[in-house]
């Protein structure tokens, strides 16, 4: 028989840098989960990813206080800021443009994000990433 799911926890955790401090500790602690077990497993699974890159993670909590987790791809906004070499996006994206990204960079980011997007078409994924870039005040060249 399958385990009974009691809930889901969604967090953004820096790759290979999970520790029991907030936000991880309180989120897992109030559900009675083993915090160190999650931290060790997450850090081991994200070893190959660039350290410090924020990764969304969905933790499935079961009735017997066990859990599983799924690590998603980094947010498109983070990948775009990294590609443009910016610390953050524009405060007024329609009037103040803060940087530029090339069409090739957009395609690379779209390919990276494909597993988490609800499309199988690379063109749709590129449109989604372009929209994120526009909303951050980035200009797409090419």
Curated annotation (Swiss-Prot):
SMART domains: RL11. The keyword Ribosomal protein applies. Pfam families: Ribosomal_L11, Ribosomal_L11_N. GO terms for molecular function: large ribosomal subunit rRNA binding; structural constituent of ribosome. PROSITE patterns: RIBOSOMAL_L11 (PS00359). Disulfide bonds: none annotated. HAMAP family: Ribosomal_uL11. Part of the ribosomal stalk of the 50S ribosomal subunit. Interacts with L10 and the large rRNA to form the base of the stalk. L10 forms an elongated spine to which L12 dimers bind in a sequential fashion forming a multimeric L10(L12)X complex. InterPro entries: Ribosomal_uL11 (IPR000911), Ribosomal_uL11_bac-typ (IPR006519), Ribosomal_uL11_C (IPR020783), Ribosomal_uL11_C_sf (IPR036769), Ribosomal_uL11_CS (IPR020785), Ribosomal_uL11_N (IPR020784), Ribosomal_uL11_N_sf (IPR036796). GO terms for cellular component: cytosolic large ribosomal subunit. Keywords: Methylation, Ribonucleoprotein, Ribosomal protein, RNA-binding, rRNA-binding. PANTHER family: 60S RIBOSOMAL PROTEIN L12, LARGE RIBOSOMAL SUBUNIT PROTEIN UL11M. GO terms for biological process: translation. Belongs to the universal ribosomal protein uL11 family. The gene is rplK. One or more lysine residues are methylated. SUPFAM superfamilies: Ribosomal L11/L12e N-terminal domain, Ribosomal protein L11, C-terminal domain. This is Large ribosomal subunit protein uL11. Forms part of the ribosomal stalk which helps the ribosome interact with GTP-bound translation factors.
